[in-house]
A protein has these predicted regions:
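N-terminal helical cap/lid subdomain that shapes the substrate entry/recognition surface
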Residues: 5-110
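Substrate-recognition element of Asp-dependent hydrolases with the DxDx(T/V) motif
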Residues: 94-106, 112-146
Length: 146
């Protein structure tokens, strides 16, 4: 623990796309969950389309067309939009959240933990994003800094 602010060594980082392989994680996990709910589609393009809705939704929030909305709600809304667009049956509320929470299970790139672990300057590593398997002391969500 740092004894003074001058000694504090903290690294706060966003993991999305840089530290975690969001695309590979979703492409790997979506087919199994789809099978569980009797859904079949091109899951690779589904993952790309799902991610592609992020910026347009954030733009709506920034413009005030949507109130401040946490990322889970935005991901769920985008998921449901894609179901309609692709003519897929809705897996129910619980199922929709199960799909949405795949964004919490993004796996790191093979060299991520080694790279983070080699930086000994930092006593605290704080990740801004949900992920699975990233070396860190704490996780931080947007709600903390809202």
């Amino acid at each position: 623990m740092a004894k003074s602010l001058a000694d504090l060594r903290v690294c706060i980082f966003d993991v999305f796309g840089t530290v975690v392989d969001w695309r590979g994680s979703l492409i790997q996990d979506l087919p199994g969950l789809g099978k569980k709910y009797g859904m079949d589609t091109d899951w690779t393009s589904f993952a790309d389309d799902w991610r592609g809705l992020y910026q347009p939704q954030m733009h709506r929030v920034r413009k005030g067309e949507l109130p401040w909305t946490n990322i889970d709600e935005l991901h769920k809304e985008a998921f449901e939009m894609l179901l309609t667009k692709r003519g897929l049956k809705h897996p129910g509320e619980e199922g929709a959240w199960e799909f949405t929470h795949l964004w919490h299970k993004l796996r790191p790139w093979p060299d991520s933990n080694e790279g983070i672990g080699n930086d000994v300057r930092f006593e605290e590593l704080i990740e801004i994003q949900h992920s699975q398997g990233v070396r860190r002391n704490q996780g931080m969500k947007a709600e903390v800094v809202r």
